[in-house]
Amino acid sequence: ISKKKFKNRYIIHALYLTLILLVTFASGERMSLATFCMGLILLFIFLKKNRLSILVTIILSALLIYLIVKIHPFYNDYRIIESTEYHQGLKVQKFYKCNESSDEICSKIIELQPSFVKVIQNFSSSAYGEIYSLSYKMFINNPITGTGINNFNYLCNHNTIYKNEMNNYECASHPHNIYIHWLAEGGLIVFGIFILYLLILVRFIINNDGENKYKFISFIIILIMFWPIMSTGSLIKNWYGITTFFIIGLCMCLSRLKSNH
């Protein structure tokens, strides 16, 4: 019975993680998919007892995604007309039936987010490249105190020096990276406080009296959430800040958890 429960637990784990990965893939959120895959890889490396379910998840997800991309019409009923690094720079011609009772094929032009490869190849002229360049200039001009919290968009729209940095795009609401955000709007003072906060948080998780596997999972979650090389939302704006600090609270609780044997 114990062996059967053991197998069932691993099957449930694998199916649950696979479902999450497939939903993330279907959502089209590339950064979410990348960070989820990063989490799976780190957990596979360090959680020895869970490697089987994680490995099954990776293999099963890769197989299902491959089949979906090959078979589902959504990924096959279009042709690429133009692909650039600019915002909405991927232009495709989408084909579909004109109506249900006819085999006549119609088409329409759709503008989508640029491909990841194009953005990397031409990063300086991409939306992220211009936003990060503008943020860096704000930090260099105000290295100690920054431009002031929540002033990024205002200065971009009303200050000629900064507005001219945005050549191909409208001003963004925030710098789209947590660390760059604090540097641009808070300078070294706020950035230093934020780094100190992260160090205290990690120390709290590591030094808790919970089981090591729960502490490690909590640490991995924090590491992925605050991974420096990725685009993010703003911690001081609406849903992103709420969900981030809620997850931090869950990690702090999880790191104190002990299994009942």
Listing of model-derived features with the role each one plays in the protein:
Residues 1-12, 254-261:
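Membrane-interface transmembrane helices that cradle and orient dolichyl/undecaprenyl
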